[in-house]
Amino acid sequence: MEKAKHVTWRLLAAGVCLLTVSSVARADSLDEQRSRYAQIKQAWDNRQMDVVEQMMPGLKDYPLYPYLEYRQITDDLMNQPAVTVTNFVRANPTLPPARTLQSRFVNELARREDWRGLLAFSPEKPGTTEAQCNYYYAKWNTGQSEEAWQGAKELWLTGKSQPNACDKLFSVWRASGKQDPLAYLERIRLAMKAGNTGLVTVLAGQMPADYQTIASAIISLANNPNTVLTFARTTGATDFTRQMAAVAFASVARQDAENARLMIPSLAQAQQLNEDQIQELRDIVAWRLMGNDVTDEQAKWRDDAIMRSQSTSLIERRVRMALGTGDRRGLNTWLARLPMEAKEKDEWRYWQADLLLERGREAEAKEILHQLMQQRGFYPMVAAQRIGEEYELKIDKAPQNVDSALTQGPEMARVRELMYWNLDNTARSEWANLVKSKSKTEQAQLARYAFNNQWWDLSVQATIAGKLWDHLEERFPLAYNDLFKRYTSGKEIPQSYAMAIARQESAWNPKVKSPVGASG
């Protein structure tokens, strides 16, 4: 019996030792892989390609190996066979750069003028505009003209300037005689609306000879919107000229609202505008007459225009103006003008209740405020405060223990390693793809996993992607607490306020950059 116990103990001890050794080996293996990964990247940066080729095969099990493989392919993309790119994309369907590689290689095959090879590599329309233009040009080059012209038309109808690769496609479409001149007018309208004067001028200059009169008028209007009345009087009234005049009129209104206001009757007569079209012009000017510097006449005209308007956003702007000036009578008037659907917004329900309280209709007001309190948001909280009741925050709890199946895939392994190397933006791209592919329950678990790992920005990102608005802990993590405590200590600004501003502006992404260069 004692001998049996001794044998059992030795077996258990051996098992524990094996588990320990195995665990250490795995840890050492990851450390070794990271070290080798850093060496390969440094060798690559120093163009020591013999070192790269020698070391890469030993890293095939490392989570970030696909990124090295991607770099290997794209560094020499002009010499890669299609099968290499196809195999890489198929082997890494969830890798963010692999998703863009297909379009890049379509463009490379177009550079080689391998049109049949392009269509064999990409039987379906690729993702980027440049690649799509090359794809449809390949269709034309291989005798599939009807598909090419359909694609050309879709790519043509935009107010943006398209990539140079599209010029070839548009050129053969035009030469085929299949491009309707009206397509020019439609794209000119879109470009004019987008403020793309350069494109308007180019397109007008390319129009057929029998369209030169309207082309010249369009160019003059695009270069000087203040000539809109001349344009309206000298061109025949059509849907196109009315739309062009409306776009130019909006530009005039931005610069001189009073000039635009006085111009409306003449413009309406010259272009034979109906009441809806005239109201569209009134709305444009009314938006510009919301300041404190308007005259009594302008204010009266503005309110008359808004009273006739069907624009919900314009009426809401007028409601806010009444609130800003403390105009209670105006508040009542303009709230009443809102369509029923808009009146159901939290903001306007609150102010309707506010007006009812002012008139002594307390029961009706409290009914609205109690209903409002059941929602999540600023006005529901204010509603509770208004009637002196406690607002109950609804907080959903994500599972503390995350399903291991969610954390053991190649995507999560890449996220972990990217975060280790402080490649936050690349990690965010991986994370976004991963979260997007999961159910709401799984998204909540991923948010919790990020929270537990102190990946604060990824926790926030998961709650946004999954619309997990009531997962407040993961949505508003108390990130960088010690840092904020240190830098707000002794200052007038409260720590909570500093953290709230940082969360609002960056969503806790330390690498985020604003359009004007602010970061973190």
Feature locations, PLM:
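Bacterial N-terminal signal peptides that target proteins for export
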Residues: E2-A13
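N-terminal signal peptide c-region/cleavage motif recognized by signal peptidases
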Residues: T20-A25
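Generic helix N-cap/helix-start motif at coil->alpha-helix transitions
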Residues: D28-R36, R47-Q48, K60-Y67, N79-Q80, ...
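Residue-level signature for tetratricopeptide repeat
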Residues: Q42, R71, D75, E108, ...
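Alpha-helical repeat scaffolds
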Residues: V51-M55, Q80-N92, D114-E124, E146-T158, ...
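Catalytic glycan-binding domains that act on GlcNAc-containing polysaccharides
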Residues: Y70, K300-R302, M307, R359-H370, ...
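Alpha-helical adaptor scaffolds
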Residues: Q72-T74, T86-R90, Q102-N107, R282-D293, ...
